[in-house]
Amino acid sequence: MKDSIRHLIQQALVRLTSEGVLPEGLTPAIQVENTKDKSHGDFASNIAMMLAKPAGMKPRELAEKLIAALPQDAQISKVEIAGPGFLNFFQNSDALAQRLETALADAQLAVHKASAKQRVVIDLSSPNLAKEMHVGHLRSTIIGDAVGRVLEFLGDEVIRQNHVGDWGTQFGMLLAYLEEKPAAAESELADLEQFYRAAKQRFDESPEFADRARELVVKLQAGDAQCLSLWTRFNDISLSHCQKIYDRLNVKLTPADVKGESAYNADLADIVEALREKGLLTEDNGAQCVFLDEFKNAEGNPLPVIVQKAGGGYLYATTDLAAMRYRSQQLHADRVLYFVDQRQALHFQMAFEVARRAGFVHEGMQLEHMGFGTMNGADGRPFKTRDGGTVKLIDLLDEAEQRAYTLVKGKNPELDEAELRQIARAVGISAVKYADLSKHRTSDYRFNFELMLSFEGNTAPYLLYAYTRVASVFRKLGKGIDEISGQIQLDAEQELALAAKLAQFGEVLNSVGEKGEPHLLCAYLYDLAGLFSSFYEHCPILGAEQEAQKQSRLRLAALTGRTLKQGLELLGLEPLERM
């Protein structure tokens, strides 16, 4: 609808320019926004205020001329001037009802991508396999997953890449411990964190063990068969731990999506050589660097991207450049989204620039760092255990499910144990995910079980319950959401408000896909649930006075239910038919 209004305004501008009211050569970015107060219409534009000065007119005077020049459109009932010169557009309720009918008849809810479809690589999760997944991995995993789901729904081809840390000096230490205690390894590897701590303790206390660890790193990097066998076994166990977490989080990551650091080992020397051939390398204290004039340190000197250490070893930047080249040349990506901590912003800005200069990525390929803030504890500091250690993700999910179980059992003591557990799992996991996804991606946030498990406010339990309310209407009716006949008619204020929000679903999803910000979808679903609650309270559905009105309201409820369910699923949450 916003695009339609922009087009109408553009036509009015062309007409006013041809009539000499506006000077030639104006190319304004026409802004159309949703209004918050529906007494001011459904959409507003500040175009008259933007162009008043070049037109040599007062904004309200230009606004009047724009309204007179606007073509007639069946979707718009009227246009008014507000305040200093805003144009307020009121939707035609019949045209709005027809748009909702189109959405109801479509499996995609009439949602289409506003721009051309693309092949998108999403770099997400990417834990270090030397340790167990902890809370720090949650944001990359679930934000990347939600954005990937939305892009797929919009029609993009999405390729997920789990760039796990499966290489590096720490693996020598782990392999030495695995070699030293093969019998105990199986049971100890069940707790990767404990295994890592035990290996680290041996490394710190025994010079002989430390020497053996360093020796094994060299052998591993040289491709020693026995070392590779031990390394593969360790990684397989670690990845199986990760996969259990992904399955539990309902995240669309599989073993086939793993493309770890080690996958690029054979390319690293070639990356350095390619940079040398392009004349981009400078030696600095024995290290091979690419200096970038656009990025300077506090003294005003260019910052380096180091791609090879003086001793010959490679760095994260080298691996990232190899991955960018692979994603361009082998995966033929149009767009690559990196869901990595905000603190890595400079690293990625510099790596992207080197990749472009070196020709590792094709012209027009979009490289975007989707940085995110930190999950903090109640004290506002990074979330830790009582003894200051990192919180294992599995422990967090266990506690969430147990708290949800206590909550659900208290509200529904009559439910059998199996259903209680199933509901508690969905509510607990959804609560953790939604508390994160509903915050702006770049914001830090405080983790709080009490708030996230509340049935009030912008929480997963509130939204899951909102969907069950819709489902209960159709259970009472004895019909499915997709079995309702009749036509939508919009009369009551609450019907119009709900309908206007339903019509915005596609626009919101396009914004999520473009910006990589799932909180926009969360805010939309929360508003939608609130508007449905008001509609449900003021507009009797099954008790409507006339049959046509009953069918219309059932159709509105059906579209609300389908939109809520689709939105929850795109966030990676599990809708429940009853709680």
Swiss-Prot record:
GO terms, biological process: arginyl-tRNA aminoacylation
Protein biosynthesis is among the record's keywords:
yes
GO cellular component entries: cytoplasm
PROSITE patterns, per the entry: AA_TRNA_LIGASE_I
> What Enzyme Commission number(s) appear in the record?
6.1.1.19
One of the Pfam families matching this protein, by short name: tRNA-synt_1d
Q: Where in the cell is it found?
A: Cytoplasm
Q: What is its main location?
A: cytoplasm
State the reactions this protein catalyses.
Answer: tRNA(Arg) + L-arginine + ATP = L-arginyl-tRNA(Arg) + AMP + diphosphate
Q: Which UniProt keywords apply?
A: Aminoacyl-tRNA synthetase, ATP-binding, Cytoplasm, Ligase, Nucleotide-binding, Protein biosynthesis
GO terms of molecular function:
arginine-tRNA ligase activity; ATP binding
Where can the motif 'HIGH' region be found? 127-137
- Which top class of enzyme applies to this chain? ligase
What HAMAP family is this protein classified in? Arg_tRNA_synth (MF_00123)
Q: Which PANTHER family does the protein's record reference?
A: ARGININE--TRNA LIGASE, CYTOPLASMIC, ARGINYL-TRNA SYNTHETASE
- Could you give the subunit structure recorded for this chain? Monomer.
| Protein family (similarity comment) | Belongs to the class-I aminoacyl-tRNA synthetase family.
Q: Sorted alphabetically, which NCBIfam families does this protein's record hold?
A: argS (TIGR00456)
Q: What is this protein called?
A: Arginine--tRNA ligase
Species: Stutzerimonas stutzeri (strain A1501) (Pseudomonas stutzeri)
Q: Which classification does the entry list for the species?
A: Bacteria, Pseudomonadati, Pseudomonadota, Gammaproteobacteria, Pseudomonadales
